[in-house]
Amino acid sequence: MSRRHAAEKREVLPDPKFGNIVVTKFMNSVMYAGKKSVAESIVYGALDLIEAKTKQAPLTVFEQALENVMPAIEVRSRRVGGATYQVPVEVRSTRRQALGIRWLITAARGRNEKTMTERLSAELLDASNNRGNAVKKREDVHKMAEANRAFSHYRW
C-alpha cells in the first residue's frame, strides 16, 4: 500500500431516473464485468416492482432499507501483546453506506427467487421492514460489538 497520499475520491454522477447518487453507487455495486446497462435494468426493475407491490415511492423504500442495514458500530482486530482483541469502533459514514449496499446485494444474491430483479426487490422490501438477511447481518455485527464492549478502551 502506497504511503504517499490517499487517492482522490472520484465524483459519482446521480442516476438518470431518480437523480440520486446513492442509487448510482448501488447500481455500480450490482454491476458485473462493466455491464452497466444490465445493472441499471436490474436496479430499476427492482424499484419498479417495489412500486407495483407497495404503491409507495420506490426511492423512500430503498432509502429506508439502506438505513435499516447500515451498521453504526463494528469490531476491528487489534493486537495487544500477543493477544488479538476484537475492538468495537464506530463506523464512519462512507463505510456505513458501502457496507449497507454490499450487504443488501449479497443478501439479494443469496435468495431463491428466479431473477435478480425479483431477489433484489424482495430483499429491499424485507430490509425496509427490518427483516431479511441483510438486516440479520447488521444485527450480528452489532451483537459482536456489544459482546466485545469490554475491549473498547483499546480503541485507536
Swiss-Prot record:
Molecular function GO labels: rRNA binding; structural constituent of ribosome; tRNA binding
Gene that encodes it: rpsG
GO terms, biological process: translation
CDD domains given in the database record: uS7_Bacteria
Family annotation (HAMAP family): Ribosomal_uS7_B
Source organism, top-level taxon: Bacteria
Recorded family membership: Belongs to the universal ribosomal protein uS7 family.
Protein's name according to its UniProt entry: Small ribosomal subunit protein uS7
Gene Ontology cellular-component terms listed: small ribosomal subunit
Record InterPro entries: Ribosomal_uS7 (IPR000235), Ribosomal_uS7_bac/org-type (IPR005717), Ribosomal_uS7_CS (IPR020606), Ribosomal_uS7_dom (IPR023798), Ribosomal_uS7_dom_sf (IPR036823)
Keyword set includes Signal: no
Lineage: Bacteria, Pseudomonadati, Pseudomonadota, Alphaproteobacteria, Hyphomicrobiales
Primary role: One of the primary rRNA binding proteins, it binds directly to 16S rRNA where it nucleates assembly of the head domain of the 30S subunit. Is located at the subunit interface close to the decoding center, probably blocks exit of the E-site tRNA.
